[in-house]
Amino acid sequence: MLGIADMQPRQLAAQVLNFALVLSTAFMMWKGLSAASDSPSPIVVVLSGSMEPAFQRGDLLFLWNRGADTQVGEIVVYNVKGKDIPIVHRVVRRYGGGKTPLRLLTKGDNNLADDTELYAAGQSFLNRQEDVIGSVVGFIPFVGYVTILLSEHPWLKQVMLGMMGVMVVLQRE
C-alpha cells in the first residue's frame, strides 16, 4: 500500500478533490433539506431524557416547518434566545393564532413543570414564527448517539476526521 508521499501530484490532487466533493455533497444535502423543510436545522438529536418515553437520548429527529399552525400535543423543537442548544418538547397550550401571533407553551413529557423557566428572561411563551425551528415528523432511534459521544469526548472528533481523511486519500479508483 502506498503512502501519501509515494503518490503522484496529480493523483494526490484527485484524492483531495474527491474528499472536497464528499464534504460539499454533504453540505448541499443539508442545505437542500433545510430549504425543503423550511427549517434551519431539519435534523436534530435528542440530548436529554426530558421527552422520555416518547424519545430517548440519542434519537435522531426529522423536522418540518411548513405549517404555521401548531396544535396542542404536537412535538416541536425550539431555540431560546441567547442559547444555542435546541430544545425538543411538547406543546401543552396555545394562545392566539389567525390575525394575532401564535404563542405556545411547551413542556417535556418527563418534566414536572412547563418550560417557562427555560424561556428567555421576560418570556412566558414561545412565538411560533420566531422561536420554533420545526415540528417533529419522524425519528430514528439512537442513531444520533454518535453526535452525543463526539460532543462529550472532543478527541473522538479528531480521530474520526483523521480516519476519514486517510481513507479518502488512500482510496484507489
Curated annotation (Swiss-Prot):
User: So what does this one do?
Assistant: Catalytic component of the signal peptidase complex (SPC) which catalyzes the cleavage of N-terminal signal sequences from nascent proteins as they are translocated into the lumen of the endoplasmic reticulum. Specifically cleaves N-terminal signal peptides that contain a hydrophobic alpha-helix (h-region) shorter than 18-20 amino acids.
Identification of the protein by name: Signal peptidase complex catalytic subunit sec11
What's its EC?
3.4.21.89
Where in or outside the cell is it found? Endoplasmic reticulum membrane
- Any idea which UniProt keywords this protein has? Endoplasmic reticulum, Hydrolase, Membrane, Protease, Signal-anchor, Transmembrane, Transmembrane helix
The active site consists of: 50 (charge relay system), 89 (charge relay system), 115 (charge relay system)
Q: Which GO terms describe its molecular function?
A: serine-type endopeptidase activity
Classification from the root reads: Eukaryota, Fungi, Dikarya, Ascomycota, Pezizomycotina
Q: What does the record say about domains?
A: The C-terminal short (CTS) helix is essential for catalytic activity. It may be accommodated as a transmembrane helix in the thinned membrane environment of the complex, similarly to the signal peptide in the complex substrates.
Gene encoding the protein: sec11
Kindly state one GO CC term assigned in the UniProt record.
Answer: signal peptidase complex
One GO BP on record is: protein targeting to ER
